[in-house]
Amino acid sequence: MRVQRVENQMIVTVIILVGLGFGWAVACIWLSQRHPEPIWDWSAIDTSDRSFPKGFLWGSATAAHQVDGGNTNNNWARWEQSFDESGRPRVHNGDAAGSACEHWERYPEDIRRMRDDLGLRSYRFSIEWSRVEPAQGQFDSDAIDHYHAMIDAIIDAGMEPMITLHHFTNPLWFEDMGGFEPEENIAHFVAFSRRMFE
């Protein structure tokens, strides 16, 4: 009797697995027919015509934490300095963004090279919120002046500045409040954004 019950359970399990496999195969076939992979006919595409629309802006983009250097007051810096459950650094060899490429200090040279060496006409960069507002409600006028000078340098170079106000890093004070999860915290980002538009 017990053997019969085990055999019945095995048969039911096999039927369920076969049914799931069949359902998966049908779903894959249906999806591939409904949303086929695009196949380019390169023989019909004139690759010698590489023109872009008039006014197209060739540019470069950076993120403050990754290039500025010295960003130690945000959640990414905290994560870079943390360890996993086994005590290993979260980043290989314990490396961190650290001084990065020192864009904070070297931006005039970087902008000149973007224009002269690469022929770029625009530059998108991010404003590091943790530098501008290192503590809740306390704005750093030196950091704001720095970003104004950077924008002026981009314009003086004949390039168009494009600004990102949030590139995935939060000031530690904001992160410790729960970041963007609590709805009431959004007001802090709105206040920062308004200050940047002044």
Where are these regions (language model features)?
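Substrate-binding cleft and catalytic face of glycoside hydrolase catalytic domains
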Residues: 69-71, 111-198
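Hydrophobic alpha-helical membrane-insertion segments, chiefly the h-region
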Residues: 20-29
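Small/flexible residues
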Residues: 4-7, 36, 80, 126
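N-terminal Sec-pathway targeting helices
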Residues: 2-20
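N-terminal carbohydrate-binding accessory modules
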Residues: 29-120
